């Protein structure tokens, strides 16, 4: 009897993608006794045909994707299934314990115990976020955390690796300068020089990889971030190609500004009226005084 009812319940749950409540199941199968319905639901839960979630004060039953296998053991209780399902929905960006508590409607003592059990069974894991080092997010054990959580290659134990980034910046610039120097020696004209002095991100990636200065595997996107900092420092330029891609080339550092440009007089709009006397004079000029201070 319960097995037959379980198939009827599964059909009802599948017809409500957002999840069916006990009231929905009672209305769909009014002739089925409550005890039989509970037994049938337990069969579906054990078989992995449905999953149980908690929305507010109510339990919700939702059909599971048949191709999606859960790592949760069949003997897990309903609270563990609810918490596991909430963590699973968080994906590789994870979910804060506060959000788990609000969605599951469990008290903190009970929730901490469930999270501890799931961590012990290596079903979920806690990961510290670079955005909030004192807080942890929970995600499934086999997931690789999103870069927004770990900070990518530039972070180690939630600390920004300033020295590592500086070394990469210097080595990327050195490679661009080597490419430019090599192009200068060939003396094949300005257009050829510009083309030969350009480097792709892939070339820079291979150079850094051959140096062996990084303990982590740096993707092209990581090195493009470093190359952009070289551009922002004024040591290189980013050139767009016809196919939409970008290449990089070293440029000579700009000449330092002259003293006239640095002092207020160099950009003063009323310098023509300035003299040793009168209202416009360097003697009483507040901009000159601030600059000298």
Curated annotation (Swiss-Prot):
Q: Which InterPro entries match?
A: RNA_pol_Rpc34 (IPR007832), RNA_pol_Rpc34-like (IPR016049), WH-like_DNA-bd_sf (IPR036388), WH_DNA-bd_sf (IPR036390)
Q: Does the keyword GTP-binding apply?
A: no
Domain of life, per UniProt, equals Eukaryota
GO terms under cellular component: RNA polymerase III complex
Coiled-coil portions: none
Pfam families per the record?
RNA_pol_Rpc34
Q: What is its main location?
A: nucleus
GO biological process terms on file: transcription by RNA polymerase III
Cellular location of this protein?
A: Nucleus
- Which of UniProt's keywords are assigned here? DNA-directed RNA polymerase, Nucleus, Transcription
The residues forming the signal peptide are none
On whether Transferase is a keyword of this UniProt record, the answer is no
* Stated role: DNA-dependent RNA polymerase catalyzes the transcription of DNA into RNA using the four ribonucleoside triphosphates as substrates. Specific peripheric component of RNA polymerase III which synthesizes small RNAs, such as 5S rRNA and tRNAs.
PANTHER family according to UniProt: RNA POLYMERASE III DNA DIRECTED , 39KD SUBUNIT-RELATED (PTHR12780)
Task: Give the family, as the similarity comment puts it.
Answer: Belongs to the eukaryotic RPC34/RPC39 RNA polymerase subunit family.
Listed under subunit, the entry gives: Component of the RNA polymerase III (Pol III) complex consisting of 17 subunits.
List the protein's name: DNA-directed RNA polymerase III subunit RPC6
Which organism's genome codes for this protein? Answer: Drosophila melanogaster
